[in-house]
């Protein structure tokens, strides 16, 4: 991360904002190590600088910060994407979405029923984690490759702390899920660190191959994380596996993307 990055890629409605990332501190020190912050932290910073009137709170029932209003207006949601990416809908906690160099963040007014659907998912995740005594146990892991299909049930994910420069020890991500299955000899996968891929800034781990299916060019593995009860389009933002934090979703699915 370039800590002196001055980014113009933040929009609230039709208004754009600049910020100096060296000035930011996270409101989630239990998740991020010093020097790292989330998309939500960018909003808090804009509020503290007087650029917007931000009202927010932390809701423990959802394990996330929520925006109550911006400049007196309610019902905000967001989309974001990383360098060389494109806009994607999501149902991912904004304070878990790591800010990276070259990222874009845009907030927009959403339908209240849409927001309540997302908040319901968050509450279900927290409840599931509590019912499992704080352990992350995935109801189902699905793998649908070019040449294989596998499913695993009740997968307890173990933190490997491979992103310990960014996250506090014990944080669990999609990367940890893959490493858990690999350590148990349930899958054979090759995971490598990429600083860049083509022109895109990555700075994360990439699933290169899984049980013989290996990516090439734009063909390879993608994934989604979410709930079977809600439309799946919200669960596929292109977030690298090392920085997609997991609380306790219904499932994780890896699929072959052409």
Which functions belong to the PLM regions below?
Residues 1-258:
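Ubiquitin-like/PB1-type beta-grasp interaction modules and other compact soluble beta-rich domains
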């Amino acid at each position: 991360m370039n800590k002196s990055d001055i980014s113009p890629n933040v929009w609230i409605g039709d208004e754009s904002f600049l910020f100096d990332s060296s000035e930011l501190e996270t409101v989630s020190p239990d998740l991020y190590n010093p020097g790292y912050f989330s998309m939500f932290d960018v909003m808090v910073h804009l509020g503290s600088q007087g650029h917007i009137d931000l009202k927010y709170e932390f809701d423990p029932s959802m394990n996330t910060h929520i925006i109550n209003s911006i400049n007196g207006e309610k019902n905000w949601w967001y989309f974001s994407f990383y360098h060389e990416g494109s806009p994607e809908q999501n149902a991912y906690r904004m304070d878990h979405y790591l800010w990276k160099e070259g990222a874009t963040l845009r907030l927009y007014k959403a339908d209240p029923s849409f927001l309540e659907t997302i908040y319901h998912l968050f509450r279900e995740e927290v409840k599931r984690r509590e019912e499992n005594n704080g352990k992350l146990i995935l109801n189902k892991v699905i793998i649908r490759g070019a040449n294989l299909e596998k499913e695993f049930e009740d997968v307890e994910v173990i933190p490997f702390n491979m992103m310990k420069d960014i996250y506090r020890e014990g944080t669990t991500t999609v990367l940890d899920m893959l490493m858990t299955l690999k350590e148990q000899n349930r899958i054979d996968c090759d995971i490598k660190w990429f600083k860049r891929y083509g022109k895109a800034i990555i700075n994360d781990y990439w699933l290169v191959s899984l049980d013989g299916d290996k990516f090439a060019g734009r063909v390879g593995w993608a994934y989604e994380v979410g709930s079977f009860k809600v439309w799946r389009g919200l669960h596929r933002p292109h977030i690298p596996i090392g920085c997609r934090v997991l609380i306790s979703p219904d499932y994780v699915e890896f699929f072959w993307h052409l």
